[in-house]
Amino acid sequence: MEKKNLLNVIKKVSFSLFIVIIYVMGLYIPLPFAEGTKQYMEAVKNTPISILGAFSGANFTRISIFSIGLNPLMFSMLIIQLLSFTHSFGFDALSPKQVQYLMQFLTMIITIIQAALLVFAFTNRRNGLEDFEMILILSAGSCLVVWLCYRNMKYGVGASAPVILTSILNGAIPNIISNVKLLLTMKYAWIWLAALAIFILLLIKFWLAFTKAYYPLKVVNPSLPASSNLMTVPLGLNMAAMMMYMVGMAILTLPLMVGRYFSSSSLINNWVFQASFSAVMGILIFYFFTFVNFDPKEQAKSFRNNHYYIPNIAPGRPTQRYLNRLIWIIAFPGAVLNAFQLVFGLYGGNFLGNYAGFAIIPMNVVMITMFMGGIKDQIDTILFPYRYDRLLKDN
């Protein structure tokens, strides 16, 4: 049994590594007929679209068959979550299989739209057949990446996390190397390098602690003895961060894709407007996924059905209203911190000059830490039976 459990872990990790290898290979397979125009390459260089793409498994810097990545999937996930959370259009009547089909259909439609926008962006020379083939190949490549992530969810570790983590590292490692080279040209270079390393370590420590931080909601359980009938329901202060970055980044790519059809002086291409829009969207998406993770209405109903209650708060609607207010308050620090880090990572380079590359480091560090933490937690869960077998053997 012990060998069987350990073998299962090795198989899952190996399958995830196999998925990553396929993804990396696809990033280096060029898209046929694609010729990046000067306008497109300048847009990639002067806008944060390449950064935005990396956080959803896309790669707009290198035009390949996997350039779109998981970007459309993030859009469809948000739409499904909105329909589910708001109970709109009779969504509750759908079976899980129907929801899955709807999500796949939405992903396909969004994939085709994004593929068309990308094709029209990186080439000015129009050829109907070539454009169609490029859109078809980009769509097929994105669908393959999505399918690989679904397979990884079943047979591997981390679902889409290994693909997105690889995409982030693909951009983060060259950025860090170039920043280190820049620091080495400065006076007291080793002091600056040490300061950068300490800053990164402190940042990792802070975000690990903040991710685990929670508000202890006290709930009375009448079935327990009166002396110890208070239970603690942990409300995470940063429970929506990962979804905010993944989904938010995917959404923010759309205005940048559409922006090329407007003049450079238009509002949509103004970086101050883009930064403000990103901040607002970041906060809204953070709050949305916080409410998705902890739905006050469903929690109030669950408390009432299990005969739990919050001290001095009546069950039912009063509890729901109390939880609503509580979530708005306790999620505020996480919403502001993550939105600030998002905006600074995307647009901090506009006022850092020669040191623009340092702006993205904090956001990269946070996302790498979160994804690696999520993968580690899943591996620990898979390893639990193996550790349990060893414990029985020792006894």
From Swiss-Prot:
It is found in: Cell membrane. This is Accessory Sec system protein translocase subunit SecY2. The lineage of its organism: Bacteria, Bacillati, Bacillota, Bacilli, Lactobacillales. Part of the accessory SecA2/SecY2 system specifically required for export of possible cell wall proteins. The central subunit of a protein translocation channel. The gene is secY2. GO terms for biological process: intracellular protein transmembrane transport; protein targeting. Its main location: membrane. It is a multi-pass membrane protein. It comes from the Bacteria. HAMAP family: SecY2 (MF_01466). Component of the accessory SecA2/SecY2 protein translocase complex required to export cell wall proteins. May form heterotrimers with SecE and SecG subunits. Pfam families: SecY (PF00344). GO terms for cellular component: plasma membrane. Belongs to the SecY/SEC61-alpha family. SecY2 subfamily. Keywords: Cell membrane, Membrane, Protein transport, Translocation, Transmembrane, Transmembrane helix, Transport. The chain crosses the membrane at residues 13-33, 63-83, 102-122, 128-148, 157-177, 190-210, 239-259, 272-292, 326-346, 355-375.
